[in-house]
Amino acid sequence: MASSLVSRPHLTQRPVRAATLASATRPRLAAGALSGRCQAQAAGDLDDAHYMRRCVELARKAAGHTSPNPMVGCVIVRDGRVVGEGFHPKAGQPHAEVFALRDAGNLAENATAYVSLEPCNHYGRTPPCTEALINAKVKEVVVGMTDPNPIVASKGIEKLQGAGISVRVGVEEALCRKLNEAYIHRMLTGKAFATLRATLSMNGIITNQIGKGADQSGGYYSQLMKEYDGVIISSDLAKMSALPLSREAGTNQPLCIIIAQGESSRLHIPSLSQEHASRAIVLADSPVTVEPAGVEVAVFRQIDLESILQLLAQRGLCSVLVDFREAGESFASLLNDFQEDKLVQKVVVEVLPFWLASDGLSNLAFGGSQSFPLKNLELRDVNGSVLLEGYV
C-alpha cells in the first residue's frame, strides 16, 4: 500500500537567544574544604538541571512537527552565560545542536553544550551532530538521555569522548524521556505509542460529548490533535461528525484512521473533501468503497489493535490517539485486554460536570475484565471538566 501520510509543513526556526544569565558567584575553596566543594557541586547540579529543562522547553516548540524524529533542544553555555540555543524543527531539517552552534558562533569554543537527547553520529538526511560539536571545539557535552535508536545508541557519546570532549549523561533524564515517550516506545517495540481517550459523565456514563472549548484553540483536545501523529476513530463518528483536527496555529493535522468493521460496501465521509482525502485511511475487514474518492483503504482479514499499531509505525507514525466516541461493540472490542497485551500506554479521561440519565444509553466497557491501577496519575481542571491522565 502506498503511504497516504501528508508531508509536514516547514517549521521556521529563528535563532533563540536567551536572556543573559549573570554568572553565579562561587566561593573560593581552600584545600580540604569539603563543605565548599559540596556547595559548588550542588550549585553545578542546579545549573545543569536548569539548562536541561530549558532544552526540553525549546524542544517542545516543535511538538507535532518532528515525527518520526524525536524532539530535541540544545543550549550552549560559556562562563555561566547562555550563548546559543536551538531546537530540531522538522524531520529532514538541521538538528538542535546545529542551530544552537550557529547561534553561539565563535563563543561555542570551550563552552558546555546541553542537549536533551544524545547527539547523532551517523549520516542521514543531515550530517552527524557529533562532528558539529567537535568542530566547534566545545569542551563538554551534557546529555539528558541516550538515544534508544540502535543506529545511535551510545555511539554519539563514544565519538565525543574519543575526541577528548567530557560527556555527562542522565541530567533530568525522566523529563527528557517523557518528552519523547512516543519515539522511545516505537524504537523499543516497533509499534506506535497509543493513548486511549474517553469522556465520562459524573455518574460514569461514557458519552460522545467533549467538554466546553476542548476542541477550540488552546483546548486540551485541540492540543492532543497537535501532538499525536494519528487518531483512531470509529466509522460511526466519521459518518456523523467532522473529522478530528487541531485548531492550533501552524499545526499539522493528524492522520485519521477510520475503523470500518462490518460495514456495507460503501462508506460516505461527509466532512472530508476529495482535496483532503489523504488526511484519512480506512481500515476495513471487507472491501469497501469510500466517498470521497482518493481515500486509501486497507483490508484486514481481522482488525486488531496490535496490527494497526504495527502498520502505523511502519508508516512513520510514532503516536496515535484512540478516540472512544460513537464506539459500538466492534470498536470497543479493539481494546479488549489492552493492558495485558501492553498495547495502550496512556489513558486520558475527561469527566464532564454533568449527571446523565442512563436510560437508553449504551455504557460500553473496554479494556477487558482485569482491574489495574494507573501510574503517575495527574488531574487538572479544564473549563469545568476534570481531565485525568495516567499511564498503564
From Swiss-Prot:
CMP/dCMP-type deaminase domain boundaries: 46-168
Enzyme class per UniProt: hydrolase
PROSITE patterns registered for this protein in UniProt: CYT_DCMP_DEAMINASES_1 (PS00903), CYT_DCMP_DEAMINASES_2 (PS51747)
Catalytic reactions of this protein: 2,5-diamino-6-hydroxy-4-(5-phosphoribosylamino)-pyrimidine + H2O + H(+) = 5-amino-6-(5-phospho-D-ribosylamino)uracil + NH4(+)
Location of this chain's protein in the cell: Plastid, Chloroplast
Residues annotated as transit peptide in the record: 1-26
Chief location bin: plastid
Cofactor(s) needed for function: Zn(2+)
InterPro entries xref list: APOBEC/CMP_deaminase_Zn-bd (IPR016192), CMP_dCMP_dom (IPR002125), Cytidine_deaminase-like (IPR016193), DHFR-like_dom_sf (IPR024072), Eubact_RibD (IPR004794)
Record GO terms (molecular function): diaminohydroxyphosphoribosylaminopyrimidine deaminase activity; zinc ion binding
Active site: 97
Biological process, per Gene Ontology: riboflavin biosynthetic process
Co-factor note (free text): Binds 1 zinc ion.
Residues annotated for Zn(2+) binding in this entry: 95, 120, 129
Gene3D superfamilies: Cytidine Deaminase, domain 2, Dihydrofolate Reductase, subunit A
EC number: 3.5.4.26
Function in brief: Monofunctional pyrimidine deaminase involved in the riboflavin biosynthesis pathway. Also has a reductase domain that lacks catalytically essential substrate-binding residues.
Protein name: Riboflavin biosynthesis protein PYRD, chloroplastic
Native source species: Zea mays
Lineage: Eukaryota, Viridiplantae, Streptophyta, Embryophyta, Tracheophyta
